[in-house]
Structures are given as structure tokens and as C-alpha cells.
Amino acid sequence: MRISGVTLFRVSSQLRNVVNGQWTTTHYTVKDRSTDPRWKDVDLARESDVYDVVIVGGGPSGLSAAIRLRQLAEKAQKELRVCVVEKASVIGGHTLSGAVIETRALDELIPNWKELGAPVYQQVTSESIAILTESGRIPVPVLPGVPLANHGNYIVRLGKVVQWLGEQAEAAGVEVWPEIAASEVLYNEDGSVKGIATSDVGIGKDGAPKDGFARGMEFHAKCTIFAEGCRGHLSKQVLDKFDLRTHAMTYGIGLKELWEIDPAKHRPGYVEHTMGWPLNVDQYGGSFLYHIEDQGQPLVSVGFVVALDYANPNLNPYKEFQKYKTHPSISKQLEGGKRIGYGARALNEGGFQSIPKLHFPGGCLVGCSAGFLNVAKLKGTHNAMKSGMVAAESIFEDIQQKGEDVQTIDPATYDKNIRDTYVVKELKATRNIRPSFNTSLGYIGGLIYSGIFYVFGRGIEPWTLGHGKKDNEKLIPVKDAKEIDYPKPDGKLTFDLLTSVSLTGTNHTEDQPAHLTLKNDQVPLDVNLAVYGGPEARFCPAGVYEFVPSEADESKKRLQINAQNCIHCKTCDIKDPQQNINWVTPEGGGGPKYEGM
């Protein structure tokens, strides 16, 4: 009998929740290691290393910061030790984006990027914007200067660009460490950030040390740059500790597939964005579809973004994406093709209003850890890179002024300097587009507002709209919500969830403490399921959360957490109604293995 890889994935996803014959949901009882007899004879001392700058996260912002630091050091003929730690098994392995990029930051950072062979070669040749109805399509003119106009931009596979940036960083003298998960922020006695510690390895799911236990390592630095991306685990901690955020962030979830399509249907350089169907008029979101030729392959990046401030707990972002692909204008481009990739990632949609204070004693936030995505443009790579570069310049200036013996850098000029760049200026100009869709006029009101105040005024209005309540506070009880009917997948154009997850390559060491932790085990049943119908089973794009019959009483439910499936999108950490789910760092190397996503 032949067993498919997807079948094995389904079975193993269930069995991984059995420990010593007992079903587990999420976490073991945390015990103080000093009083836990299982740890009595274990050496818990950590080795440490000292750098000038430690960067957490090997994405566009972190790598740009690293490269810029080394460029400045070389120009000044100064020794400067810089390292990047990245939790993915390879640089670019956790990167997922559309992506159409502006090259302005890349032009500045590495002017000869074309000669160096950067995987940035598919220029936008044509584009369209439309509002979809269930079977129709209403074209929207692409006026020069509107946020979604893409003349002069490039379609890329961002994971490949990030991999290339990693190579440039190493060539510049940066120490780049993939498969290293930063799990803890270290502090000096005065409360300033001292650096980070990496995760321990070799701990069983029950919290006991295994034979191969190895203590994590400490990385100390004058300044630590947090470049973890949207809703970073450590970034979230420093935001709270230093009280950096004044206004709440609002988020979206972006889901993406990569297709190899019929060459006869391929239009290299074509970019398409849509709004409307299948989402309701009171729901913010939309789609992207990009034709890119990559080494002769006729590829299409197709994706769907759903704002996470939605109210209906029955909404399923993954199924909305699958439904979108059945639209006649979309399906005709994909039919006859083969899907070769899938993934999802939360993204920042707060914009200008939600930018936090960016610096603090011993560190700073860059890229999507700070929230520099321009949701009106559906672009953030250029802003992420530029923020990393500006942070690097501020840090290097401080080291130069205060001397190499300085212990802690608080790069205060970074906050001011970034606000003088195009990064914050373009976010300010588009600041009211996203929240305008949350007015009483809904979707139509947002379109009208954007047309009047941005297209003709470029954001000059003297007011700034707010985002209102946090995303997790906006769900309504399931008894008050409209049911949503989703068609069954056909296995050709639309797919079931676990088949999709199998394309992510996601994997975690099975016998390790689950990284999806619950503050209270009863909240999923007493609140999430009882009041909201169990929304975590729908908003997760990887099938991590399931409500299944309890073994003790089949008339009752229990929450099963398939942590092995997790693709590190962070949606659960954002949308869980009671903020009861806390995403923590698993062992390094775990998670998805995206290839050029």
C-alpha cells in the first residue's frame, strides 16, 4: 500500500500530541529549575560572546542594518563586530511576501546590485486594479501617484533576495548565524538591554532535560537591533518593558501560493490587485497576483490579505483565499498550472499612527518589528531596509562619539532621523487610508475617502483617524454572527488546509516544549469555544488548533494544539480574543522551509 506524504503529515500531526500515553494540548507545568529535581545535576551556566552590535532576525531590515554597519566601519577603518541570528534553518527560509518592491533602499545600500547578481530582474510591465463582484469585475484606473501604482518597480521572490542579502552581509564581514533562535532578552543591572540569549536545546515536551541537552548561549552587545518581523517574540517584550507604544497596532494575515502556470497564459511583469469579493463590504482586505519569470519558469505569485480586525468569528482567512481563486478572472490564469508553494504571515497594517518609540537603552526596533509596512502600497521591503540602514548609521555615530569602550548605546537619533526620511513621510501621507475603511460607511466609505483625500490631496488633511480597539477585541459572539458557507476544495484549483501546509516544509523537533503556550487551559473552552465558536480553529492558516472530542467524555470538547504544523505566522498571538495564546520561540531551525516565497 502506498502512503502519500500528505497522509503521513496528517497522522503525524495527531500523534505528536501524545506524551507518555497522555494527550497534551500546549505546555507542561512550568517549574523553577532550581527546585525541580530533574534539573538538580544539570549545569545551567551559559557561554557568552561579545559583539558591538547583535541583530535579531535575518530579514531585509536586519541584514541591511548589518551591511550598513560594516560599510561604515570599513570607511572609518574601525573594527566593528556585528552578528545576525536567525531562527530559520537557512537565511530566507522564513521569508514570505508578495512581493513587488521599490529598489530605492537597495540602490542606496548596494548601488551595483545588478552587477553583483541580485535576484531582482522582473520589472513590472503592466498592471491593473479591480473591484470584484461574485462573477464580475469593475476596473479601477491606475492613476499616476496612487499608492498601488507600480511603474518602475520589480516583482521578486523575496526569500531569494534575502538569501542574497545574507551572502552580501557575510562578504562584508558580518557573522551570520542561521538556525539560532533568540529566546530571551538580557538586561544589565540598570535595566538597559545587554543582549540576547539563544534557546536551550534538548528539553523534552514534559520539561525535563534530555541526554542531548545543551544550554543556550548569551550574545552581549553595545546595542541590540530587533528585526524579527511582525509581532516578533522579543520585540513584543521590549515594547512592553519600555512602554514604547502609544497607539495600538492593527494587523492583517497574508496568505500566498506560488504557481507554475501554462506558458501560454504567462504575462511576465503583469501585476494585479483586487478588492471586494469574496469579502463582505465591512471587511478590509484584498488580493495580489504577480506574473514573474524565474530562470525560465512561468510563475505566478497569488495571495490574499485579510485584515485581522474582522468581527465575524466564522470568517476563515484560508478559505476566503481559496474561494477568491474560483473567480472567473482569477481561475482562468491558474487553470492548467501546478501549485508549488504555500505559506502565510501576519503583517502590520497600523501605519503612521502605530509607529512606536523606536529606541531604548541598549537597543532599537527596525522593519516590521517597528511597523513600517505601507499597507496602502502593499509594500514594506524598501521601508524595512531603509530603517535598518538609518538605525545602523545612528548606532555607529554613537559608538564613534562615545568611544569603543562604551557599554550601552541608546540610539536616540535613530527616531528623529527615520522621521526625516521617505519612510515616515510616505506613511504619514497614507495614514488615513486604512482606518477610513472602518468608518460607518464601511468599504465604500473607505474608497471614497481615499479617492478624495489621497489622490487629490496626498494626505494633507489636518486630522489623523484612529484604529479603535485592538484586533482581538473586535470579535462578536458567534450567536450574533452570520454563518459563512465555503465550497469544498476540488484538489485542482482549491485545496484542503493540510495539503497546503505540507507544501511549507514546516517541521519542529517533536519532543520539545510546545511553543504555543496557554496562560489558562480553560479559556479556550469557557470563552473561545463557548462564546466565539472556537475562532482559533479558523484563523490559523496551518491547522494548528482543533476542537476535538474529549477522551474522558466524548460529549465534550478539548483543544488540541498541533504545534508541529505551525508556520510562525503569529496570527494566533494577535487575534486570540483573551490574549491567552502566547507564541514563544521554539528550538532554532524549526518552522517553515520556504523556498523563494
UniProtKB/Swiss-Prot annotation:
Q: Which residues lie within the membrane without crossing it?
A: 91-112, 409-426
Annotated compartments:
Mitochondrion inner membrane
PROSITE patterns recorded for this chain?
4FE4S_FER_2 (PS51379)
Annotated [4Fe-4S] cluster binding sites = 540, 566, 569, 572
Enzyme Commission code: 1.5.5.1
- Give me any GO biological process, just one: electron transport chain
Q: Give one GO term, molecular function aspect.
A: metal ion binding
Q: Give UniProt keywords alphabetically.
A: 4Fe-4S, Electron transport, FAD, Flavoprotein, Iron, Iron-sulfur, Membrane, Metal-binding, Mitochondrion, Mitochondrion inner membrane, Oxidoreductase, Transit peptide, Transport, Ubiquinone
Question: For this UniProt entry, what is the primary localization, expressed as one broad class?
Answer: mitochondrion
Q: Which domain of life is it from?
A: Eukaryota
Reaction catalysed by this chain? a ubiquinone + reduced [electron-transfer flavoprotein] = a ubiquinol + oxidized [electron-transfer flavoprotein] + H(+)
Locate the residues binding FAD. 53-67
Q: Which residues form the 4Fe-4S ferredoxin-type domain?
A: 557-586
| Pfam families referenced in this protein's UniProt entry, alphabetically | ETFQO_UQ-bd (PF21162), Fer4_ETF_QO (PF05187), NAD_binding_8 (PF13450)
Q: Looking at its record, which EC class is this enzyme?
A: oxidoreductase
List the InterPro entries hit by this protein, alphabetically.
4Fe4S_Fe-S-bd, ETF-QO, ETF-QO/FixC_UQ-bd, ETF-QO/FixX_C, FAD/NAD-bd_sf
| Residues reported in the UniProt entry to bind a ubiquinone | 285-286
Recorded GO CC terms: mitochondrial inner membrane; mitochondrion
Family that this chain belongs to? Belongs to the ETF-QO/FixC family.
Q: How does it assemble?
A: Monomer.
Q: Which PANTHER family match?
A: ELECTRON TRANSFER FLAVOPROTEIN-UBIQUINONE OXIDOREDUCTASE, ELECTRON TRANSFER FLAVOPROTEIN-UBIQUINONE OXIDOREDUCTASE, MITOCHONDRIAL
What's the protein name? Electron transfer flavoprotein-ubiquinone oxidoreductase, mitochondrial
Q: What is the name of the gene encoding this protein?
A: let-721
